[in-house]
Amino acid sequence: MTDISVSKIRNFCIIAHIDHGKSTLADRLLQDTGTVQQRDMQEQFLDSMDLERERGITIKLQAARMKYKADDSQEYVLNLIDTPGHVDFSYEVSRSLQACEGALLVVDASQGVEAQTLANVYLALENNLEIIPVLNKVDLPGADAEKIKQEIEEIIGLDTSNAINCSAKTGVGIKDILEAIVRRVPPPQDEIKLPTKALIFDSYYDPYRGVIVYFRVISGSLNKREKILLMASKKNYELDEIGIMAPDQQQVDELHAGEVGYLAASIKSVADARVGDTITLLNSPANDPLPGYKTANPMVFCGLFPTDADQFPDLRVSLEKLQLSDAALKYEPETSSAMGFGFRCGFLGLLHMEIVQERLEREYDLDLIVTAPSVIYKVNLNQQEHIFIDNPSTIPDPQLRESIEEPYVKMEIYAPNEFNGTLMGLCQERRGVFIDMKYITTDRVTLIYEIPLAEVVTDFFDQMKSRTQGYASMEYHLIGYRKNDLVRLDVLINSERADPLTSIVHKDKAYGIGRSLVEKLKELIPKQQFKIPIQASIGSRIIASESISALRKDVLSKCYGGDISRKKKLLKKQAKGKKRMKAMGKVEVPQEAFMAVLKLNQ
């Protein structure tokens, strides 16, 4: 399999916005090169998770090796490395770009360039990839290829004179794409003589073989009889098998520089074979690892609690298993008076959080409650000391701290300019600071804002989509911490603080949020035998309060006429009982109440 010369290898990836037809194009390439037989073909062949097919997004990377006989009658090996298009997974994109020499930039001919595409194109340019613009969906009635070409030139500055028009659905232009890959994407550098280095660009957990690592050999070669060393984790392993993805795994004996393959070596967890790590040989290791390896840091945190306390051990086990295949997921145990035992989890972003939650519920059959998402705050205790906190309920009281700083992001929103006003309104509501506005074309605009991350992680994306009929797209990156007038808003139910409902809000918004929280809880908490006060407080100051009246048993029903003093005695006894109950009683807050309030919190 591997006797092909380096000059005949082409490694490429596909960059596209969600829904611009990347997975369909990948399917079509697999089909046209005869890699996948017609009968085995299914829609979105490379998106292997059910969740990916359902949401129509690519989450985990896949890779496939295709053989293609070009017009010059030479046979080439094309390695397609699939990339996710969503902003949460940008680290997955950056590492797959590192494994390629070229990229197909797929743009929907009826929609134009979107924010995510742009972010990934810049990553590709940083990695010096050859970019081939492809206009997909040219068969649609609304497609305007010329206008979009002009847009690509204006926004990205790419020459589109030899852009390819194609329709992945009907198969138009697929041959041109394959030819362009062969002609325009440079072959890998021939570095077989150098010490072995291979870049891990993906890994997943297989319950039988341990972690399966996808890698690209950068220099030297890997033989299946060797012992390997992972340079970042300093661990060594004996190889069980190495092979290629075609797109099903096929074992081979050896892989050379420039080739893409997989290996299994009984590795226990994905954390040991971190993506971006360098594989080298144990006996003759390389001097230094490949550059650019970063661990992915979580930006969004939330609590995950099982609805049934007995499921806590199952949740622990399933998080451990999920972490085997998702190295960006971080978690630690947490307890809460209201929710019992659970975990505090860190995610790359909101989509990542939703996907982890869905995978836990779907693949491990758990029923979960998720607390409101929060970000990492920097709390300045005094001039010298500061701490970082990801759980709002652990922030120290006002007298123990000087100020709270929150993370800010620089956000770029791309949209048709008729939605300019509504988008500016949305950013203002979310405490955004206006930086700049640029007209890309006559009818498309870029808005640049600096905005607190906490305002973005709740439902900013949904709001932006609904206010612009789905036309806007956005992209953001962290720019640092800033001081703000932030307060910790607590919710007290029967004078006890409900931790999961604690949030950090801006002082100006605190009253409104507190008011709506207590009103919502009043509707949702069932009546008890005693009166329940519900309060929202900042420190020791109550800013909003409601109370749920007690259920009242009619103790006088058996008195008929009777003496007034007898009635008074019974009522007094009832009042005494209620008082004792109020002191002793615990209010069971139903999970629906938490869920509804968390939605409202956003």
Curated annotation (Swiss-Prot):
Instruction: Please list the residue ranges annotated as the tr-type G domain.
Output: 7-189
Name the Enzyme Commission number(s) assigned to this protein: 3.6.5.n1
Taxonomic superkingdom = Bacteria
Coarse class of the primary localization is: membrane
Q: Which CDD domains match?
A: EF4_II, EF4_III, LepA, lepA_C
Disulfide partners: none
Task: Give yes or no: UniProt keyword Hydrolase.
Answer: yes
Give the location in the cell.
Cell inner membrane
Q: Give the GO cellular component terms, alphabetically.
A: plasma membrane
Instruction: Show the Gene3D superfamilies listed in the entry.
Output: 3.30.70.240, Elongation factor 4, C-terminal domain, Elongation Factor G (Translational Gtpase), domain 3, P-loop containing nucleotide triphosphate hydrolases, Translation factors
Q: Which one of the record's GO molecular function terms can you name? A: ribosome binding
In the record, biological process GO terms are: positive regulation of translation; translation
Q: Which residues bind GTP?
A: D19, H20, G21, K22, S23, T24, N136, K137, V138, D139
List the catalysed reactions. GTP + H2O = GDP + phosphate + H(+)
Matches recorded under InterPro entries: EF-4, EFG_III/V, EFG_V-like, EFTu-like_2, G_TR_CS, GUFP, LepA_C_sf, LepA_CTD
- Alphabetic keyword roster: Cell inner membrane, Cell membrane, GTP-binding, Hydrolase, Membrane, Nucleotide-binding, Protein biosynthesis
Where would one find coiled-coil regions in this protein?
none
Q: How does it sit in the membrane?
A: Peripheral membrane protein
Record family assignment = Belongs to the TRAFAC class translation factor GTPase superfamily. Classic translation factor GTPase family. LepA subfamily.
Function of the molecule: Required for accurate and efficient protein synthesis under certain stress conditions. May act as a fidelity factor of the translation reaction, by catalyzing a one-codon backward translocation of tRNAs on improperly translocated ribosomes. Back-translocation proceeds from a post-translocation (POST) complex to a pre-translocation (PRE) complex, thus giving elongation factor G a second chance to translocate the tRNAs correctly. Binds to ribosomes in a GTP-dependent manner.
State the name under which the record lists this protein.
Elongation factor 4
What organism is this sequence from?
Prochlorococcus marinus (strain AS9601)
Gene encoding this chain? lepA
